[in-house]
UniProtKB/Swiss-Prot annotation:
Keyword Glycoprotein listed: no
Organismal lineage: Bacteria, Pseudomonadati, Pseudomonadota, Alphaproteobacteria, Hyphomicrobiales
Enzyme class: transferase
Protein name in the entry: DNA-directed RNA polymerase subunit alpha
Organism expressing this protein natively: Brucella abortus (strain 2308)
Alphabetized GO MF terms: DNA binding; DNA-directed RNA polymerase activity; protein dimerization activity
NCBIfam families for the chain: PRK05182.1-2 (NF003513), PRK05182.2-5 (NF003519), rpoA (TIGR02027)
Top-level taxon: Bacteria
Protein family (similarity comment): Belongs to the RNA polymerase alpha chain family.
SUPFAM superfamilies referenced in this protein's UniProt entry, alphabetically: C-terminal domain of RNA polymerase alpha subunit (SSF47789), Insert subdomain of RNA polymerase alpha subunit (SSF56553), RBP11-like subunits of RNA polymerase (SSF55257)
């Protein structure tokens, strides 16, 4: 009785993932859901997607010749505050845990982009075209970045270590790989019921994770967090014993003829004559086989040899052939032939 509380609720019979040809954008559609569950699940997934998925981000930067973020650098058009804001937007994927170090060194004139950063093996820059700063003629800049992993948003103040050397500038860290999430609820039909919920999630990521995977991770987080509230064990439901009736014929007759080691000519002749299973084949007489177009004595002898190796021959009678559920039987007995 108590299991009906969750077993009889309608669940989505399909979840569609639409990528729009991009790794950074995805739409997830789930339907049908019980009334109210679209809002319940949509809101919960959105919050977890934005706050709880782990990612990588720059936590601090050290720029040669700069003591604090309110400085300016000769020959660099942006001041340090703007450079730090640009650094915050660098999208990073990192395998394993941090912290890791990355360095960029460049001479002007030109633009310094995220793609100029020299990364270590397990760190990847996902938006290499992102502009960090612009150098004039004769200008030079060298920056060293600290990269770490975490979740959510961590302000620069929390990235400031007490023993940090002078000139190490903390950066706001946007660890979450998910940039934007929106959802909408619409009515959908299931059978005669017209007002079930249809949940559509639109997700934008930084490319370190796909929208489909992000939703899967968020759902797993919710599943893990909610499991603590379940204070009972479900009674084990015994699977009904499937009654398998005794076959009235050799299971080998359920094997398809295209699995036999026949020549291409012989196999094509059987296919053209709509002979699918060995059970179809052995009921044919030699005379019937020879009337098959393009089927000659050589093909006949080949088939007779193959059947003989299985203890079978042409012209056999099988009263119960073909069974109504032949495809199901073929799958059930495929390990017996």
């Amino acid at each position: 009785m108590i299991q009906k509380n969750w077993q009889e609720l309608i669940k989505p019979n399909k979840v569609d993932f639409i990528t729009h040809g991009s790794r950074t954008h995805a739409t997830v559609v789930a339907e049908p859901l019980e009334r109210g569950f679209g809002l319940t699940l949509g809101n919960a997934l959105r919050r977890v997607l934005l706050s709880s998925l782990r990612g990588a981000a720059v936590t601090a930067v050290q720029i040669d010749g700069v003591l604090h973020e309110f400085s300016s650098i000769p020959g660099v058009r942006e001041d340090v505050t703007d450079i730090v804001l640009n650094i915050k937007e660098i999208a990073i994927r990192m395998e394993g845990e941090g912290p890791k170090r990355m360095v960029v060194r460049k001479e002007g004139p030109g633009v310094v982009t995220a793609g100029d950063i020299q990364t270590v093996g397990d760190v990847e820059i996902l938006n290499p075209e992102h502009v960090i700063c612009t150098l004039d003629e004769g200008a030079e800049i060298r920056m060293e970045f600290t990269v770490n992993t975490g979740k959510g948003y961590v302000p620069a103040d929390r990235n400031r270590a007490e023993d940090a050397p002078i000139g190490l500038i903390p950066v706001d860290s946007l660890y979450s790989p998910v940039r934007k999430v929106s959802y909408k609820i619409e009515n959908t039909r299931e059978g005669q019921v017209l007002d079930y919920d249809k949940l559509t999630l639109n997700i934008e990521t930084n490319g370190s994770v796909t929208g489909e995977d992000a939703v899967a991770y968020a759902a797993r987080i919710l599943q893990d967090q909610l499991s603590i509230f379940v204070n009972f064990e479900e009674p084990q439901k015994e699977a009904p014993q499937e009654q398998v009736a005794e076959l009235a014929f050799n299971p080998a007759l359920l094997k398809k003829v295209d699995e036999l080691e026949l020549s291409v000519r012989s196999a094509n002749c059987l296919k053209n004559d709509n002979i699918v299973y060995i059970g179809d084949l052995i009921q044919k007489t030699e005379a019937e086989m020879l009337r098959t177009p393009n089927f000659g004595r050589k093909s006949l002898n080949e088939i007779k040899e193959v059947l003989a190796s299985m203890g079978l021959h042409l012209g056999m009678e099988i009263p119960a052939w073909p069974p109504e559920n032949i495809e199901d039987l073929a799958k059930r007995y495929e390990d017996q032939y």
